[in-house]
Amino acid sequence: MTDMTLLNALSDDQDFAGRHNGPNAAQQNIMLKAISAESVEQLIAQTVPADIRLPEPMKLDPAQSEADMLTSLKAIASKNIINRSYIGQGYYNNLTPNVVLRNVLENPGWYTAYTPYQPEISQGRLESLLNYQQMIMDLTSMELANASLLDEATAAAEAMTLCLRAGKSKSKAFFVSNDLHPQTVDVVRTRAEYIGIEIITGSVEELDNHDVFGALVQYPGTTGSITDLTDIIEKAHAKKTLVAVASDLLALTLLKAPGEMGADVVIGSAQRFGVPMGFGGPHAGFMATKDKHKRTMPGRVIGVSKDARGNQSLRMAMQTREQHIRREKATSNICTAQALLANMAAFYALYHGPEGLRKIGRRVHHLTAILAAGLRNSGIELASDTFFDTITLNTGKKTDDFYKKALAAGINLRKFDVQLGISLDETTKVSDVEELLAIFTGNKLKASMFTADIAADEFAAIPESCRRTSKYLTHPVFNEHHSETQMMRYMKKLENKDYSLTHGMIPLGSCTMKLNAAAEMIPITWPEFGSLHPFAPADQTKGYQELASKLSEMLCSVTGYDAFSLQPNSGAQGEYAGLIAIQRYHQHNGDSHRNVCLIPSSAHGTNPASAAMVSMKVVVVGCDEKGNVDVEDLKVKIEKHRDNLSCIMITYPSTHGVYEEAVREVCDLVHDAGGQVYLDGANMNAQVGLTNPGFIGSDVSHLNLHKTFCIPHGGGGPGMGPIGVKSHLAPFLPGHVQSTSDEGQQYAVSAAELGSASILPISYAYIAMMGEEGLTEATKLAILNANYVMERLRPHYPVLYRGTEGRIAHECIIDIRPLKEASGISEEDVAKRLMDYGFHAPTMSFPVAGTLMIEPTESEDLAELDRFCDAMIAIRQEIARVQEGEWPIDDNPLVHAPHTQADLMETEWNRAYSREIACFPTDHTRASKYWPTVNRVDNVFGDRNLICSCPSIDSYIED
């Protein structure tokens, strides 16, 4: 061994890959023997079609150690300049309570959980999201709120389409106030363009002059002014116009709520409730509406129900509205929400309580009033005499001088043509106000000079008719957790109710619940990334620009694409952006008539829902008995729609968990007919390093960074869905109203140019630490793990789809339908019984009803895979006891699952099976038990008796 060979052998650069990937070499050998493969390479050769295997490795820098990655990323972050930003425009500095920072944002018990589709093991975050909904409902005075949307601008676009669905006007025009945040207007315009809505803009006072189905106004306006909307909304309703109001939660602690003015929908951002600006995200957008619009409201809604014992329980309500069920007829294509950020905002409200929030609001307003008084006294004109936290100054020819003077002092202001905007926030101090006064007046004015006059009429800048008199956050939960001890214990109590990756494997097919490593998460709380305003001057954001550029280059190397947009905030939003790029490409080529989108019957529900959002005609392509796209049916559909064919949306490997042999033929057939190929990146975890969309023949894809590239699921968000394209589509990527680039500025899909920018370091860190070898190894091990699980379960459960050589990709589908026919036990019974064994359920009934889809990922080691397989085999044996008549169909551990501590302590046990079988079916559960906190939740009761707020429901539940 040479000196250099020894040095290389002792290097720690490859250590991270070994820690991320679960099975070590010895475990791999055991697994390979079990599946009758001589090596991992032989398995891959039997699994991935040879004609799509990459001829050479990905071009990525060598892997970095954790320490080296953090050092290099810190150097990038340090290039961001953190000035005092008074830009406002929907983004504000705030103080994240440290108790929330440490116990939620930095806690894998909160950030590694999945969306709470399994309510029995999700009661903690369901309760927190219910608190969030109650907070939004109270502050807006509306009857119903959802559990978050992707951002404020997305919420505005969704409000527009809600008004269209729910309204009775025959108009196809929508009014947008000219005092709305410009980034919101951009996203609304994009949505309107593709569904045939005409946008009319003007002052809010002009609304009555127009025949429109809906209107979007802002309160307070983007320039800070406050208008009483009561009469305006009343006149709109007289003309069958629904009115959506964009508002600010902190302002609503002092201002009359939009609901009290008659608003039909209220939207906004919960960012300033304890969530860092993060250069634009992620943040929880909110939406509240009237109860009568509940069936047409987009997004997830948490509701109250009861469990099998009649005890109160929580669940996601009205799921039949969602895209995975209604597909192209869904109210929205939204899948991921912003659960983690919504929870942070809810905890912020709990920690401060109503009095604490009002105190913060009063302080911000008081400092704004002092600033306004000092400026007025110095002869500077304000554009409006009404304000909460934002004032706009008529600075005329001095605008540039004042702006540059502020920049020289390390201060960012909002610049208009001949005006300057100043927005104060929770972090603003008296000394900050005095510094601002000095910049504009040239004098060292003291705030104390103006406080006495302002205190005498504290709310003079708020019109009397707009001052809040109603109470909010009166529920005990907002009034009991104001000490850090109380808060810490409450958050821990909720966390302990939930199942996350801290407990065990989450084998959800198509969801890729892999490791979210601590080193990847560390940078997101650095102030260099968290404290930057998304509209700060470009010379202050060089760190983010470099991060975005490097990550885009990495993703291009991984995918075979030529350009990336990091703007989309979720996979579904990425689909939407990618389809817009395709349609704009066709329009550019004079092919505006091309609007047919071919979608296999096995596709994710977001695919047809996204296609519907750009007014495409969805044509379904069948699948053959092996789960592949039926090429003959595809040829028929292409020929029928050849002249109008826009694209095909495929997933690879397919949602059936196999690498389709004919994928290149599919791409060629579509291209030959003038169409584009959209490859859904949901299953990219089975491609990285082995093949890629560009090499296969795709034109555009979104990547779920919260799947393949390690951004955690957060209990239901955040997610990110950047889109990659081949060069011919690059000019049609999303842009932004604040963009410094000239490309793609025709439309935007998110409020901020880089979407949820502050979580980009997670994916960057993952790729940097894994390197080419580690990433490729991860893909191979994801395939090995899945095939091992499949082979262990195959003697006990039918496996629905396999490739030509009997292998599967990174996930497999087991068929429960024959067992249900023979025993009466359903896939839901199996899923709930797995909870008693200490596991989260696999994906139920997708893409095939009556099945379970299992994806172990590369991060789980052999011991955990065996624990899961042993549980599934034991459950199959339990089903056999039902089949054989030993246990009645209505009294067995599967139909009563999951079991709780209350079951264990029941005075009389009258069931056909023992308590031990119910609660401690394995040695592992006897040694370390995860307890569901409720029995099986009654979904039907929850939807028939819809309650989406915090107050006790004892009076609603009948015996």
UniProtKB/Swiss-Prot annotation:
Its EC number is 1.4.4.2. The keyword Oxidoreductase applies. It catalyses: N(6)-[(R)-lipoyl]-L-lysyl-[glycine-cleavage complex H protein] + glycine + H(+) = N(6)-[(R)-S(8)-aminomethyldihydrolipoyl]-L-lysyl-[glycine-cleavage complex H protein] + CO2. Keywords: Oxidoreductase, Pyridoxal phosphate. InterPro entries: GcvP (IPR003437), GDC-P_C (IPR049316), GDC-P_N (IPR049315), GDC_P (IPR020581), PyrdxlP-dep_Trfase (IPR015424), PyrdxlP-dep_Trfase_major (IPR015421), PyrdxlP-dep_Trfase_small (IPR015422). GO terms for molecular function: glycine binding; glycine dehydrogenase (decarboxylating) activity; pyridoxal phosphate binding. SUPFAM superfamilies: PLP-dependent transferases. Pfam families: GcvP2_C, GDC-P. Its cofactor is pyridoxal 5'-phosphate. Disulfide bonds: none annotated. GO terms for biological process: glycine decarboxylation via glycine cleavage system. The modification N6-(pyridoxal phosphate)lysine is found at K707. GO terms for cellular component: cytosol; glycine cleavage complex. It is an enzyme of class 1 (oxidoreductase). The glycine cleavage system catalyzes the degradation of glycine. The P protein binds the alpha-amino group of glycine through its pyridoxal phosphate cofactor; CO(2) is released and the remaining methylamine moiety is then transferred to the lipoamide cofactor of the H protein. PANTHER family: GLYCINE DEHYDROGENASE (DECARBOXYLATING) (PTHR11773:SF13), GLYCINE DEHYDROGENASE, DECARBOXYLATING (PTHR11773). NCBIfam families: gcvP, PRK04366.1. Belongs to the GcvP family. The glycine cleavage system is composed of four proteins: P, T, L and H. This is Glycine dehydrogenase (decarboxylating). It comes from Photobacterium profundum (strain SS9). The gene is gcvP.
